[in-house]
């Protein structure tokens, strides 16, 4: 609450926050929903139902999947569907999670904000799948791909190919330099990558 009030002093009127729903008690989601209600007349708080441990890699104490908990978060009042495909245990789980994100957003008429390709691996290409699915569903402007660090490592031929799809899909990007300038490139020798997406 103190942090939100400090942001408001700097003129911020809309804040989006990711609530980890792979805590089976949904502690952060419940707290953010309370804050959203309390501050609704002074700031717009958007909450992402976010599976930090993955939609299909996570299994809760009662057998619930991350995908089920994301959906529960949406039913409770979260504004956005979150995902983290590159963090799933295998590529297939990541791909499945992108399909689920778009399906849930369409089902509940929600926005999408995915931690997408936040890795140094130039072969992590979930932004391509997310963009294609958003384009097919006609929801591109409701989609945000956050981080997309792998695009900073991708070769020019692939990026040139991807650009046409990104333009057609009209998805949004959120670059996070304060995080990714120090999180990415840690395993590199020299020269070290900067870790931010292509801007």
Language-model features, listed with the residues they occupy:
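Active-site pocket-lining segments that scaffold enzyme catalytic pockets across diverse folds
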Residues: 15, 24
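A structural signal for isolated positions on well-ordered beta-strands in alpha/beta enzyme cores
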Residues: 16, 44-48, 113, 144, ...
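Short acidic/polar active-site loop segments enriched in Thr and Asp
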Residues: 13-14, 79
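Active-site beta-loop-alpha junctions enriched in small/polar residues
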Residues: 20-22, 48-55, 84-88, 115-121, ...
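Histidine/acidic residue-rich metal-binding segments in metalloenzymes
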Residues: 27-38, 60-144, 150-172, 188-199
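Metal-associated gating/positioning segment near the N- to mid-region
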Residues: 1-5, 16-19
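Glycine/threonine-rich flexible loop motifs
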Residues: 183-187
């Amino acid at each position: 609450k103190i942090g939100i009030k400090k942001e408001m002093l700097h003129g911020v009127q809309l804040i989006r926050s990711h609530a980890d729903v792979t805590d089976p008690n949904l502690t952060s989601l419940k707290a953010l929903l309370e804050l959203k209600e309390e501050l609704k007349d002074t700031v717009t708080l958007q909450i992402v139902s976010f599976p930090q441990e993955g939609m299909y890699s996570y299994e809760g104490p009662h057998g619930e999947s991350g995908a089920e908990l994301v959906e529960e978060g949406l039913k409770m009042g979260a504004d956005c569907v979150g995902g983290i495909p590159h963090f799933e245990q295998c590529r297939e789980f990541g791909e499945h999670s992108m399909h689920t994100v778009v399906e849930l957003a369409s089902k509940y008429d929600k926005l999408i904000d995915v931690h997408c390709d936040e890795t140094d691996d130039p072969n992590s290409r979930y932004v391509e799948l997310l963009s294609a699915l958003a384009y097919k569903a006609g929801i591109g402007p409701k989609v945000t791909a956050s981080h997309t660090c792998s695009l900073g490592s991708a070769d020019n031929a692939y990026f040139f190919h991807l650009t046409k799809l990104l333009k057609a899909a009209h998805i949004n990007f959120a670059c996070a330099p304060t995080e990714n300038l120090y999180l990415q490139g840690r395993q590199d020798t020299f020269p070290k990558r900067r870790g931010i997406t292509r801007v």
